Amino acid sequence: MSSPVICISKSETIFEALMLMIQKGISHLVITEKDVPVGVISEWDWMTAQQRHPAALIHSIKSADSAESLAEIRKEMMPLIEQIFEEEGQAESLTRLITEIHDQITCRLIELGLGEMEKKGRGGTPSEFSWMGMGSEGRREQTVITDQDNALIFKDPGPERLSQTRQWFLDFAEKVVSGLEICGFPRCRGNTMAINPELCLTEEEWLKLFGGILQKPTPEALLKAGIYFDFRSLYGKHELVEKLRNKLMDLSPRSRLFLKMMSENDLDAGRPPVQQWGWKIRRLLGFGNLTVDLKQHALRPLVMGIRTLALSAGITESHSLERIRELEKRGELSANLSQALQSAYDFIMLLKIRRNFITHENENLSGNEVSLKQLNPLEQRFLEESLKVILRLQDEVYARFGGIP
């Protein structure tokens, strides 16, 4: 049996056992019932049931010696995820697994980048640091087709060494970002990457940036908040990121103008089309080909609305479903709306993942647009109901904060 010995409750799913093995880097788990060992589950059990095992990918990632090798390993991920998609069919589980594999690729590229800096005579890290994932990566909600959103935080080395230290990290970040690009993660068009000097900052500089966004919520600041405020540490000194998160969660509930502007921005960013007269008439008469942009008109407004509520309540969780559950637990969302939002999120994310697989095979297709004609009647109904739930969320958020003076 692998060491250390980790236990998992008998009530957990096989997928939870798989994720625990991947995260802990072990091949066996002790199954317990009321804290009493009742059995053992291993990688072999998963391989017997599933034919492939994600842990094998993780082992390959950790031993890869180049970005090109990692790119080949990532290609192996696609059929594996598609198989699990067909068998598991749970969006939260799938996005967690996809994100975990992407995290491992990023961490290996960081290790390779650090090694390369030393080989070139640049030395080791000049200060403690953490590589941060932002946006969907920060929320652990990545799908198979995604671009980069990352940043870097480092401990202030003092005014004499600050410029030199920042340049070291910028040069290092270029190696990681280039490696991610080789692995199939395009560079962010908005330059939300650690190679951007505005996102390669000390602790104090990050606090100043976040404070400025909260105090002066201009349209540009709100756009940044929609990406930067979903963040987590992937590698390095995690405490640097947690201190930043705790400070943000202390300030955001008291930033009333920011919350007001965020709620208005949530509406301006786009409303699901399901209640528009054009949609209703065409749906009733069967005219034309109705399409929905799953990112722009479904996931994005859902994520934005939940983020605003989470910031107002000082909730530290970053995954949208975890935020929804915590909001319900705190009485910030009704149980009815909470359950409806969770169902809507799961269904829409599954549609998006399915669309990603189709797009991966045919690059001429959009990865986010889905036509109602491509769905069966039950799926059409579920999609429309999900969009109506998102409209309810937007109205709830605006009613709560839109009128704040």
PLM features: what roles do these ranges have?
Residues 13, 45-46, 147:
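Histidine- and aromatic-rich ligand-binding microenvironments
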Residues 44-60:
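A short, polar/charged loop-to-alpha-helix boundary motif
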Residues 56-405:
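A nucleotide- and high-energy phosphate-metabolite-utilizing enzyme signature
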Residues 1-5, 147:
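Bateman (tandem CBS) regulatory domains
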